[in-house]
Amino acid sequence: MHICIPVTEELQDTLGCRFVLYSVYLEGFLLFKVRYKDLHLWNEQIHRVFGNGLPKFPPKHYLAMTKNMANERRLQLEQYLQQIVTDPVVTSSDIFMDYFRKLQMDTFNMPTVKLILRVYVPDGAAVELDVRTSDSAERVLEAALFRLGVSRELAEYFSLFITHKEAKGPFTVVKRIAAFELPFLTIWNLEDDQFQIEVRKWYMNPSNDVMLMGSTEAIDILYLQAVQEFQMDWTRPTKDQEQKLQHCLKEENKLKFLELMKTVEYYGYLQIASCASDYPECDSEVNVWVGNNEMSCHFHSPGGHTEHLRLNIRDLICWNVSLLQPKKQEVMSPNHQHLEFKFEYQQGSSLKCITIRTEQAFLLSSCLKKMLSEYPVHRSKEELEIQVDRAQATHKFNIRPVQNGVHTKKQTLLKDKAEYCLIDDISDLNL
C-alpha cells in the first residue's frame, strides 16, 4: 500500500483562522481529507493504546510556517501515514478502523445508511449484500464469501478488487481494495458505471490452489477466474492444451479444467493492460504478466523489433511507482491517472533500468510485494528494496531491509505483515 499527499488546500474555519487540508491518496485514489490538528489529536489517542512503538508524528509549529516548513510537514505526514497503514497490529485495532472510517465518511459527506451492494464474481454474476455505507472491505468480503458459501477460514486467499469492463473492450483489474477502505465509497467516487467490486483470489503462486481444493464453493470461484483468464487470452496454452480445455468447458468439468490450467503458461498470473515503455526504445509497447515468482515482459518497438524479458523475483533489485501530478488547473481523477512503474534488475554484472507507463502501476507493485511475502526463502532474500516516489516533488521513499535491528535517527521503522523495513528520504539525484 502506498500513501501520498499530492494535494493540499488552504482554507478558513468559521472563526476566520486559516488552516491546511491534506488530501490523502491511497494508491492513486483519494482516501480522505484531514487537518493536521485532527491527526495530531488522534495520534495522542493511539499512543495511549500502543505506546512508543508508533512512528514519530510531525511536531507542532507555534509560529507561522514558511513554505519549506509546510512542505516538510506534508512529507512527514506522508511517512507517518505510510507506516501506520502498513502496521497490521494498528490497522486491525478498533481505534484505527473507527477513525479511518470517520475520515472517509466525512470527506465524502456520506451518512451511514443501509443499502444493497452488488459484489461480482469473475463470470459477471453478482451477489447482493445487505450492508451499510460505512462497512469496511474486510466486513464486505466476509459477507460476500458467506453468501458464496466459502468458509471464513479461507478468507485470507481472497480479496475485493475494483475491476473495469468496457462493453466492447478489455477487462482490467484496477486495484485491490485495502481492508480498511469502505468499498461503497470507493466505487461511488468513480464516475464510470463500468467499474465494479469483484471477489478474486489473492495470491500470486498458483500452487496455493491446493489449499482451496477441499471447498466446493472455493473451487467454483477458482474455476470462474481460470475460465476468465483463459477466455481473455491472459494465458498462453498450446493448441493441444486449448483443445483439451475447450472440451472441459463443454463438459463443465471444473476440477479437470483447473488441473489442466496448472500446466498452461501464465496461469494464475495477473496481466497488465498493454502499455508504453522506454525499452528497447522510446514509445515501445509492452505486455506484462506477473505471478509465480516472476515478471514477464513482451516488448514491441515502433521499428518492429520484439523482445521477451523474463525476470525472477530474485533478479529485481528495486522498483518505484511515480504518481505524476496534474497541472494546477487540472484535478486529479482516479479514472485517469498518470503513473510510471520503474524497475531495476541484474543482467550479468550490470544493472538495467526500465520505465513502464501504466495506470495499473500500484497494482503491479502490490503483486510484487505479495510475491515477496509468499516466496519460500530466508527473510534476507525476501526483502527487496522498494522505492516509492512522486514525480514533480522532491520527496521520495526508499525502503530497505532492516539489518541487525539498528536504525539511525533519520530512519523510521516500517512494520509490515511479511517484512520489517526502513524508510528514509532520498534526493532526486538518486533516480
From Swiss-Prot:
Keyword terms, alphabetized: Protein transport, Transport
Domain (PX): residue spans on this chain: 1-107
The keyword Transport belongs to this UniProt entry's keyword annotation: yes
UniProt-listed Pfam families: PX, SNX17-27-31_F1_FERM, SNX17_FERM_C
GO molecular function, a single term: phosphatidylinositol binding
Domain of life of the organism encoding this protein: Eukaryota
GO BP term (any one): intracellular protein transport
Record keyword Transport present: yes
Cysteines engaged in disulfide bonds, as pairs: none
GO CC aspect terms: early endosome
Family the entry assigns: Belongs to the sorting nexin family.
Protein role: May be involved in protein trafficking.
Name recorded for this polypeptide: Sorting nexin-31
Organism: Xenopus laevis (African clawed frog)
